[in-house]
């Protein structure tokens, strides 16, 4: 708990510098100085420097989304409405749009791209796990791939949405979720079409052999909280 507290302290000190210097080593060093932290301790808390705090910032948003969602009445909502709500709460959990804009550029760099993809995958996994997804086959992957794409596209749209209420972003999100639902309807029609299902028996059999990973903390999206 003490370690997490010190990381949060360092992250809070770094955010004002991120606006001007991005998620950089300079911002990290400024934050260390601002909280009068020993550089050796800072290196232990964040061995990779700025990228570790950028990761912590993203995960902080995930944690806040989960906290707010769990206190929101959702029993009467359809699955698509729950997904929409979760993505919206995730965006509303972000207190600093400029920090996210800088993070988007930071994680777009080739050396950071894999970490950025892992974070988005983790957000999608948190949402599906929170919604009670029990998939044990290829659907475990397809749901998270699809939601990762929806979330990533919505974040980029949100960054360019200057409307204070972000109405355009929520409309964009609704359209993306609708697109996903249409794909699911199409998949259902394929399964219901006996001649087509028979023609695809081979590929479907192979897909059926794909299983969801067993819980492991070192896999994308499989954090201890999952």
Show which residues each predicted segment covers.
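Short, amphipathic alpha-helix enriched in basic
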Residues: 2-40, 48-55, 59
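C-terminal ligand-sensing/allosteric alpha-helical core of TetR-family HTH transcriptional regulators
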Residues: 79-93, 119, 123-130, 176
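Amphipathic alpha-helical packing segments from all-alpha helical-bundle domains
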Residues: 111-133, 141-148, 152
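Hydrophobic alpha-helical connector segments
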Residues: 68-102
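Amphipathic alpha-helical segments used for helix-helix packing
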Residues: 93-114, 118
């Amino acid at each position: 708990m003490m370690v997490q507290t010190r990381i949060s302290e360092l992250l809070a000190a770094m955010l004002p510098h991120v606006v001007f210097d991005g998620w950089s080593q300079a911002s990290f060093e400024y934050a260390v100085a601002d909280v009068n932290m020993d550089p050796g301790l800072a290196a232990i808390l964040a061995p990779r420097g700025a990228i570790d705090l950028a990761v912590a910032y993203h995960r902080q948003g995930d944690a806040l989304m989960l906290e707010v969602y769990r206190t929101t009445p959702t029993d009467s909502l359809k699955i698509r409405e729950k997904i929409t709500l979760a993505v919206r709460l995730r965006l509303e959990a972000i207190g600093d749009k400029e920090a996210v804009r800088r993070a988007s550029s930071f994680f777009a760099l080739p050396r950071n791209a894999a970490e950025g993809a892992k974070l988005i995958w983790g957000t999608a996994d948190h949402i599906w796990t929170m919604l009670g997804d029990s998939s044990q086959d290829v659907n475990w992957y397809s749901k998270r791939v699809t939601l990762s794409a929806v979330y990533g596209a919505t974040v980029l749209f949100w960054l360019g949405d200057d409307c204070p209420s972000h109405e355009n972003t929520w409309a964009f999100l609704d359209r993306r979720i609708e697109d996903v639902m249409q794909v699911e309807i199409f998949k259902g029609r394929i399964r219901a079409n006996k001649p087509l299902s028979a023609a695809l028996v081979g590929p479907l059999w192979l897909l059926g052999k794909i299983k969801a990973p067993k819980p492991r903390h070192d896999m994308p999206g499989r954090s201890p909280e999952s």
